[in-house]
Amino acid sequence: MRENFKELPMGVRDYLPGEAALRRYLENLFVELVAKEGFQEVITPSFEYYETLRESSETDLIKFVDRTGELLALRGDMTTPIARVVSTKMKHRELPLKIFYAATVFSGNFSGRNKLREFKQLGIEVFGDITSKLESDLIKLMAVYLRKAKVKNLEISLGHVDILTGLIEEYELFNHFSEIKNALNQKDYVALEGIFERAGKSQRVRESLVDFLQQRGGKAILRKAKKMLSHPKAKKALEELEEVTEYLISEGVRELKLDFSLVRDLNYYTGLVFEAYTPYLGYPLGGGGRYDTLLKKFGWDTPAFGFALGLERIVESIANSIDK
């Protein structure tokens, strides 16, 4: 018998009565809120075929082989399993489909900001008729929930995948896309300038690109972006961002920051992306965005939009804000 049999493996933990009660309260608060907005719950298995799940975060999946020799994996997020369910079993229902979940997910990478290998996600996904107003309303719904959960000093960062895509095409950086995306995810602007240098860009262009991708703020930075980017994809993305920002402000969501470097670290996003932050946590509470191609893999070509929040992260941020 192992000497540490009384201990837990790294990346998992127990929740004692006080914290367990808070987790249950926050989960119930989410379920009640989204159910009132017409969302219906879907429950999926904790593990599926590896090939089904690899689209989302291949390197982080916990994989294993069962007794029949099948390669399986624990789900690393809920968007891909939900996409599979609605594509294969629900696509003939009235659109838009509005789905919610409160489910445990798993990660093989628990370094850096991912401290846990097992954690709970609270999320919603909408499939079908995705309009700019619907996207805005879902971001507002996330903000309303986090306010009700008593998350202090909430900030919501908004970005768009096609800002980076347009920039890469305009400045002919195709061969460096993965490097650029990784540097942006790490907010490593020194590495970013090095990538531009290896791509043969002049010092003036390098400095201009890095300065642009560091921009975070209100609507004023959109004007600067429109002057710098001429690629049709980027210009359309900026127009969409402006439309969503104006609508959210008119609806009382003022915790907004535009962030041109926001790309998120999942592979399937195709449009608007966003993340929720608080100064009481050193990483996002959660986030989401638009994904129009993921469902094609399962035989249904339809747009989708959603978000997921980390329950443990919400609890941690609340505890940190009380301590301070």
Curated annotation (Swiss-Prot):
What keywords are annotated for this sequence in UniProt?
A: Amino-acid biosynthesis, Cytoplasm, Histidine biosynthesis
Q: What one GO molecular function would you report for this record?
A: catalytic activity, acting on a protein
Q: Which Pfam families match?
A: tRNA-synt_His (PF13393)
This chain's function reads: Required for the first step of histidine biosynthesis. May allow the feedback regulation of ATP phosphoribosyltransferase activity by histidine.
Extra remark? This function is generally fulfilled by the C-terminal part of HisG, which is missing in some bacteria such as this one.
User: Where would you find this protein in the cell?
Assistant: Cytoplasm
Protein name (database record):
ATP phosphoribosyltransferase regulatory subunit
Q: How does it assemble?
A: Heteromultimer composed of HisG and HisZ subunits.
Q: Which domain of life is it from?
A: Bacteria
